[in-house]
Amino acid sequence: MAVFADLDLRAGSDLKALRGLVETAAHLGYSVVAINHIVDFKEKKQEIEKPVAVSELFTTLPIVQGKSRPIKILTRLTIIVSDPSHCNVLRATSSRARLYDVVAVFPKTEKLFHIACTHLDVDLVCITVTEKLPFYFKRPPINVAIDRGLAFELVYSPAIKDSTMRRYTISSALNLMQICKGKNVIISSAAERPLEIRGPYDVANLGLLFGLSESDAKAAVSTNCRAALLHGETRKTAFGIISTVKKPRPSEGDEDCLPASKKAKCEG
């Protein structure tokens, strides 16, 4: 059975409202959620805060509907970048950013989108859905992002609220799918209220409207989310998985086949 995730529940100052979001997600069958703290350096006095502690939200975690285990609550940081200087905090992951399980970047220009895909130390690249896409997607940076293990995130709650945003969301999604062909796409709610969250199978059906195949749409709320979380774990520890192969020593018969220089070293 698939493990479903919603990696964008909007963090606010109201902890009671945040609890309601998490409880609703668990009731709908999500096993993993991420509480999203958003920073826009274009606004004054913006800084990266410490993530919300799970212990502040719940003494006992809600049980996932249809499962016998509690929901897993992770933390996420999203940086909105509208100027190249905003990227500095994400080039070599800052100590504050490393406190978060997931780090996302929301680039506002084509140049910043290219930088995000090719250089920034993040897990997710957010796609604009609340306004007309300010640039066209190009294949080279998207292919680099896929090779680096980054995921592209589309959010659906704006499409629920407003018909104009619904058009923007579908248009942005279809433009993205033309290039990435459904690879490394995740779909999140960006919910601020419980009524804005939809069940994982409803979200997968929504993915069909976004141009995803049936299997890619399901992956967008399950396996692709898991891959993004594993990418975040690697980023936080700054170590990948290293595979070592022990080189066998040459046998006496093999030494006759060695070049003269290497044979001399072996004899020495």
Curated annotation (Swiss-Prot):
One of its GO terms (cellular component) is nucleus. The modification N-acetylalanine is found at A2. GO terms for biological process: rRNA processing; tRNA 5'-leader removal; tRNA processing. GO terms for molecular function: ribonuclease P activity; ribonuclease P RNA binding; RNA binding. It is found in: Nucleus, Nucleolus. Residues 247-268 are annotated as: Disordered. Keywords: Acetylation, Nucleus, Phosphoprotein, RNA-binding, rRNA processing, tRNA processing. It comes from the Eukaryota. The modification Phosphoserine is found at S251. It holds the Pfam family RNase_P_p30. Belongs to the eukaryotic/archaeal RNase P protein component 3 family. Component of ribonuclease P, a ribonucleoprotein complex that generates mature tRNA molecules by cleaving their 5'-ends. Also a component of the MRP ribonuclease complex, which cleaves pre-rRNA sequences. Component of nuclear RNase P and RNase MRP ribonucleoproteins. RNase P consists of a catalytic RNA moiety and about 10 protein subunits; POP1, POP4, POP5, POP7, RPP14, RPP21, RPP25, RPP30, RPP38 and RPP40. Within the RNase P complex, POP1, POP7 and RPP25 form the 'finger' subcomplex, POP5, RPP14, RPP40 and homodimeric RPP30 form the 'palm' subcomplex, and RPP21, POP4 and RPP38 form the 'wrist' subcomplex. All subunits of the RNase P complex interact with the catalytic RNA. Several subunits of RNase P are also part of the RNase MRP complex. Autoantibodies against RPP30 are found in sera from scleroderma patients. This is Ribonuclease P protein subunit p30.
